[in-house]
Regions:
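Histidine-centered, transition-metal-coordinating active-site segments
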Residues: 1-10, 44-48, 53-297
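Well-ordered mid-protein domain cores that form the structural environment of catalytic cofactors
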Residues: 1-47, 51-53
Length: 297
């Protein structure tokens, strides 16, 4: 997408790869649980946690903390969801002075950052469809309930049989991603032309997202999200796993809080004990969190 629009591919790739660094174990359920644990200690947000990682926690150099990423990268990560609305949260987790007045919090992010954000949505929705089918939460044929997928499914319906079912899933998802990207490119070019976007300043002050779907595909995306909500996210087995993930996170927080010296370094504890606990837990994988929980339950 960035290449087609003659934008900075390296910046777009960096933002896309770095965005999920701040995710907790057990996805959004884990994030909600950790945020509840940190309610009285500043809260938790996975987007801002990504910034904490690249600015403070990942240390590779003698002269400074963090990875010394460009201000364009930091701004893109900070504004993953658009202009910054909760300055108080940013101040608690990062510190507004950290950016030294180099970032205007109320403006829109770069086109590269907008591409990264919407690409995340494209990948998220399509791969959740694929995962839902593979997990037997719904069947491929049920995609006919979504207008967007209906025409794609009909195109391959006669070819699908039990021997090529998995290939059919890949093909339909591939077509879906292709259609979304084509629509995104067409609509973005239309926006740039109509609003006469010529500079970074024009982008920042545009007052809207420029990299976005047409109204038709935006409505389709809402349909897809509703389908996934009813068929997958609200499924009893999924909710049960999410609940277990929350229990594990909260239990680990309690365990580490009761004896932080056993898990954290002296340097970590001298700054902010609870933030250090949050950093530690958010950096765990699902497997590590489960194993640690099993050792102490």
């Amino acid at each position: 997408i960035a290449k087609y629009l003659n934008l900075n591919e390296d910046l777009t790739e960096t933002l896309s790869l770095a965005h999920d660094l701040g995710h907790t174990p057990f996805g959004h359920a884990g994030e909600d649980a950790l945020d509840e644990c940190m309610e009285n200690y500043g809260g938790f947000d996975h987007n801002l946690q990504t910034l904490r990682i690249v600015m403070f926690l990942e240390n590779k150099y003698f002269k400074f903390k963090g990875l010394n990423l460009s201000i364009e990268t930091l701004e893109g990560l900070l504004k993953h969801n658009g202009p910054v609305k909760d300055l108080d949260l940013v101040n608690r987790l990062i510190g507004l002075k950290t950016f030294k007045d180099k970032i205007k919090f109320s403006t829109y992010p770069s086109l590269e950052a907008q591409i990264s954000a919407i690409s995340d949505d494209i990948a998220y929705n399509n791969h959740d469809i694929q995962d839902g089918i593979n997990a037997n939460l719904f069947k491929l044929e049920e995609l006919m309930e979504i207008d967007f997928f209906k025409s794609i499914y009909i195109k391959y319906k006669k070819k699908i049989n039990k021997n090529n079912y998995k290939i059919a899933i890949y093909q339909i998802i591939r077509d879906s991603i292709d259609l979304m990207i084509r629509d995104l490119l067409t609509n973005t070019q239309k926006n740039l032309k109509e609003l006469k976007i010529k500079s970074l300043k024009d982008i920042s002050n545009s007052g809207q997202l420029l990299v976005c779907f047409s109204n038709k595909i935006q409505n389709s995306e809402k349909e897809i999200k509703y389908f996934l909500r009813t068929k997958m996210y609200d499924n009893k087995s999924v909710l049960k796993k999410n609940k277990r993930g929350k229990v594990i996170i909260k239990r680990l927080f309690k365990i580490i809080k009761s004896n932080p010296k056993k898990f954290l370094t002296k340097d970590q504890l001298t700054k902010d004990k609870f933030r250090a606990i949050s950093d530690f837990i958010s950096g765990m994988t699902d497997r590590y969190a489960i194993n640690l929980y099993n050792n102490y339950k």
